[in-house]
C-alpha cells in the first residue's frame, strides 16, 4: 500500500512547538545583529526579525504577505545565483551572519550548498538553522515532490548525517518541533573547506541514500533533541549578540505588524469604495440609456 504523509513513523504531537515559535525564541534571546534567510515564501519567518537587525533574504519567487522589516534586503534569485553575484558580509555592513536560516530547495545537494555558502560568512559564535531535518515519514522525505503532499521536507535530513560524518568539529542537533524538525548547528568555522572540497564525492554518496538508512536509530543518527524552549536555549550561545530591551524590540515588531494590518484594512476599504462607485456609475449610465 502506498505510504502517505499520514502514515508517519512517529506520532506528530500538536503539543510540540511550531518552528516559527522556535525561530521567534532564537531572535528574542540572541538579539542578532545580522540575519540571513534562504527561502522566504510568504515572509512568515522573515517577519520575526526584530528592529535593529540587518537582514538579507533570498528566494527566486518571494510572495511576501507578512510585515517584514523595511530594512530587510530581499533578493529575487536562487541562492546559487546570489552567492555567485553578491558578497553577503558586505551587504551586512561587513559583519558576520549571527543567525542564518536555511529553508530553500528541499533537496540534499541544494541545502548542503546553502550551508557551505552561509558558513563562509559566519563567525565562530554564529548559529545556522536548517528546516525540515526530522521528516515525519518516508513519503515526506522523498526527493520527488507530489502536489498532493502537505509538509514535504525532501531529503534535507541527509545534511545532518553528512555533517556528523564530515564535520565532527561542529555541534549538530535537531530539535523535534513541528512540522518536520529544525537543525541547529554551532561551532562554525568560516575557514573550513572540507565540505566544498568533497562536495562531488559527498553528493555521490548521499543523494542516492535511501530513507531506510533511518530505519534503525533515527533519533541517534539525526541527533534528535526535544524541542522545548529550555532544551533549544541550551544549544544556543549564552549571550545575546547586542544589547537591547527585548520587550521594547518585540513592541517595535508588533507595531510593524499593526501598521501592516492597518494598511491592508485601508486598502480593502478603498477597493470596496471603488467597486461601489463603479457600480453606481454603471447603474447611472444604464438609467440614462433607458430614458
Feature annotation, model-predicted:
Residues 1-101, 105-129, 133-291:
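A short alpha-helical cap/connector motif
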